[in-house]
């Protein structure tokens, strides 16, 4: 069905699904996936030989609302996964310099420590998830992509006029800037987009009537090309979608 919705030619999409609500679809083969993380789904994407390494991408849909302790545990668990990936042994090991990308609906409505943990590797429950460690290969924190809306001076990624919650930045993209270069990042919002722009882009005004994360990272000199989209139209129906406009990978989730 995905090949019908978004045809890319060739062998079509490579797809893996976790046991919760996330799907990762890639133009390139998916070497391995790790569905064991709590509400987080990691996959190693086999990039073409023009890239120095493959890409380790993790989609996330963390617990909502007042579940701060659960979200913190999930963030701690992802940091543990990254530390494992960057060192020999364990459940996953990737070569030095492999681009690491973490993106999705983090439901970040509670304590700021959760985002701090994802960015810096500052684990809160060390007894369970092990020691802290830097997230990027060069010993620095992950980079957080700022994604202002395309057609409004706003940066929130979620809004509901019928909800008690205010508009908020709930969806995020973190990446290792030692291995990937950010070229563009923005949040797609079609309901206020000019008709001529909609026509050029092949969009309709209702496609993202709620803000939709469209975050684009493009690399140079063999560095990783990364793209992620969270579709507002699907999100308004209780789903979310990540899309690479150039066809590298697609992420679907709740």
Regions found by a protein language model. Give the residues of each.
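Beta-strand-turn-beta hairpins that frame and shape the catalytic cleft
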Residues: 28-32, 39-64, 254
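Stable alpha-helical elements in mature extracytoplasmic
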Residues: 1-2, 21, 71-81, 111-114, ...
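Metal-dependent phosphoester-hydrolase catalytic domains
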Residues: 35-38, 87-101, 107-254
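Active-site surface patch of divalent metal-dependent phosphodiester/phosphate bond hydrolases
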Residues: 1-36
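Active-site-proximal beta-strand/loop segments in catalytic clefts of secreted hydrolases
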Residues: 15-21, 25-28, 58-63, 102-107, ...
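Loop/turn elements at helix/coil->beta-strand transitions in domains of secreted/extracellular proteins
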Residues: 8-13, 31, 50-56, 95-100
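A shared catalytic/ligand-binding motif for oxyanion handling
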Residues: 53-61, 69-75, 162
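A long, amphipathic alpha-helix that forms part
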Residues: 68-94
């Amino acid at each position: 069905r995905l090949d019908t919705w978004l045809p890319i030619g060739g062998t079509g999409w490579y797809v893996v699904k976790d046991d919760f609500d996330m799907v990762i679809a890639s133009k390139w083969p998916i070497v391995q996936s790790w569905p064991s993380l709590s509400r987080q789904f990691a996959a190693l994407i086999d990039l073409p030989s023009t890239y120095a390494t493959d890409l380790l991408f993790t989609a996330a849909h963390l617990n909502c609302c007042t579940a701060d302790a659960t979200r913190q545990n999930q963030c701690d668990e992802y940091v543990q996964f990254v530390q494992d990936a960057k060192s020999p042994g364990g459940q996953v090991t990737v070569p030095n310099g492999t681009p690491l990308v973490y993106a999705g609906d983090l439901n970040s409505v509670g304590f700021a420590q959760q985002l701090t943990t994802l960015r810096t590797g500052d684990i809160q429950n060390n007894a369970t998830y092990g020691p802290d460690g830097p997230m990027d290969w060069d010993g620095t924190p992950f980079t957080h992509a700022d994604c202002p809306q395309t057609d409004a001076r706003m940066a929130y990624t979620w809004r509901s006029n019928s909800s008690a919650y205010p508009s908020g930045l709930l969806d995020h993209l973190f990446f290792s800037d030692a291995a990937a270069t950010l070229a563009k990042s923005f949040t797609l919002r079609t309901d206020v987009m000019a008709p001529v722009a909609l026509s050029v882009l092949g969009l309709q005004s209702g496609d993202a009537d709620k803000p939709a994360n469209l975050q684009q990272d493009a690399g140079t000199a063999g560095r990783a090309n990364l793209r992620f989209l969270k579709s507002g139209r699907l999100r308004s129906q209780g789903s979310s979608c990540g899309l690479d406009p150039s066809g590298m990978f697609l992420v679907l989730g709740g």
